[in-house]
Regions:
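Ser/Thr-centric signal marking residues that sit
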Residues: 114, 166, 195, 207
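Conserved small/polar residues in nucleotide/adenosyl-binding loops
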Residues: 206-213
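Gly/Ser/Thr-rich active-site loops/lids in small-molecule metabolic enzymes
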Residues: 183-198
Length: 213
C-alpha cells in the first residue's frame, strides 16, 4: 500500500491517512509513504513560474531538503499515535534520515527505502545547458547534494536504510521533452528496473563511497 503526501490529485490528508493506517493495522498491513510538504512546494513553484524561472534547475529549488524532512517528521508523529510500522519510500536527504533515527530512538518501527539515482546522481544534472538532458532527470524527490549521497551510502552500509528500489517510471525522452519551457509539465520519474542490480553491484565493488569503506 502506498500513500502520497504530495501531488494534489493523489495526496492523502492527515485524517484519511490515520484512518487508513488504523485499518491496515487490523490486518497486519504496512504502508509506504512518499514524504514531501505539498503546500510549500506548490507555493515555491508558483513563485518560480511568476518570476519566469521555468527551467529544470527550478525543480530541485522548489523541493528543498527541509520539505522532505518536515514531511517525514510529520508522518512519523502520526504513525506514533497510530501505533503502526511504516516504510519511508525513496528517501533522499540527510535531514529526513535524521528524523527516522529520532523516531527509532523513541521506539518506533520505521523502514527506509532509497533509490539508485539518489546514491549515484546529484543535483548538478538539473543545471545542464541542454534542456532535454536536464529534463530527463526530473523526479520527486529530486536529486540532492553530494553530501546527501555520502550519508545515504553510510546509512545503507550500517543498516539504517534497508531497501534500494527503483521507483521505476518508464517515460521516453520524447515524453520528457513534452514539458519543454515549463519544468512542471515534464513527466516525473526515471526508469530503473533493468539497471538497479548492475549499478549497485558495480558501485559496491569498484567505486567509493561504498559500504566497504
Amino acid at each position: 500500500f502506498k500513500m502520497y503526501m504530495t501531488y494534489p490529485a493523489m495526496m492523502i490528508g492527515d485524517q484519511d491517512m490515520f484512518c487508513a493506517l488504523q485499518e491496515l493495522k487490523k490486518y497486519g498491513g504496512i504502508a509506504g509513504v512518499h514524504c514531501e510538504n505539498a503546500g510549500v512546494i506548490d507555493a515555491l513553484i508558483a513563485a518560480h513560474k511568476a518570476a519566469g524561472q521555468t527551467a529544470p534547475s527550478s525543480h530541485p529549488e522548489c523541493r528543498p531538503n527541509p520539505l522532505e524532512a518536515e514531511a517525514v517528521a510529520h508522518l512519523l508523529r502520526i504513525t506514533e499515535v497510530a501505533g503502526v510500522p511504516i516504510v519511508i519510500v525513496h528517501l533522499s536527504t540527510k535531514e529526513a534520515l535524521l528524523e527516522v533515527m529520532r523516531a527509532r530512538a523513541r521506539g518506533q518501527q520505521v523502514y527506509v527505502e532509497t533509490c539508485p539515482h539518489y546514491l549515484l546522481l546529484d543535483d548538478s544534472v538539473y543545471y545542464q545547458e541542454d534542456y532535454s538532458a536536464a529534463a530527463r532527470f526530473i523526479c520527486a524527490p529530486p536529486m540532492r547534494k553530494k553530501e546527501d549521497q555520502e550519508v545515504l551510502w553510510k546509512a545503507l552500509a550500517n543498516g539504517t536504510i534497508q531497501t534500494v528500489s527503483t521507483d521505476h517510471c518508464s517515460f521516453t525522452l520524447q515524453q520528457k521533452d513534452a514539458g519543454r519551457g515549463d519544468f512542471t509539465k515534464i513527466p516525473g520519474g526515471l526508469p530503473g528496473v533493468e539497471t538497479r542490480g548492475e549499478l549497485l553491484y558495480t558501485c559496491l565493488l569498484y567505486t567509493s563511497p561504498s559500504p566497504r569503506d
